[in-house]
């Protein structure tokens, strides 16, 4: 049986970023991924939703325009990226050509 999360991704974008969401969704579909949800970062619940998907291992990656779309706070970005890494989930940024974003522990 094929792993159900094999090609599933989550799109996480800033509030009112409909054009960005559409562009990233088109990239995901072109790359053969299934978008399980597009989350707009409008409030604290958006971050909770992001963590929900990561902690349940239902996706292989999170697609963002840039990692600062996750949060403007560096510690929050690092916490989310660390959680994702612990679950084998990459955070891929459009600004990096959809390469996985890397975290610095300095």
Give each language-model segment a name.
Residues 1-106:
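Short, structured surface patches at the beginning of a domain
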């Amino acid at each position: 049986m094929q792993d159900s999360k094999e090609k599933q991704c989550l799109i996480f974008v800033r509030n009112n970023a409909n054009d960005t969401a559409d562009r990233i969704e088109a990239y995901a579909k072109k790359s053969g991924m299934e978008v399980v949800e597009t989350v707009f970062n409008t409030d604290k619940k958006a971050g909770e939703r992001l963590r929900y998907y990561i902690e349940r291992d239902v996706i292989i990656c999170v697609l963002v325009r840039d990692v600062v779309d996750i949060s403007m706070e560096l510690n929050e970005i690092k916490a989310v990226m660390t959680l994702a890494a612990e679950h084998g989930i990459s955070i891929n940024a459009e600004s990096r050509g959809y390469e996985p974003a890397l975290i610095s522990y300095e």
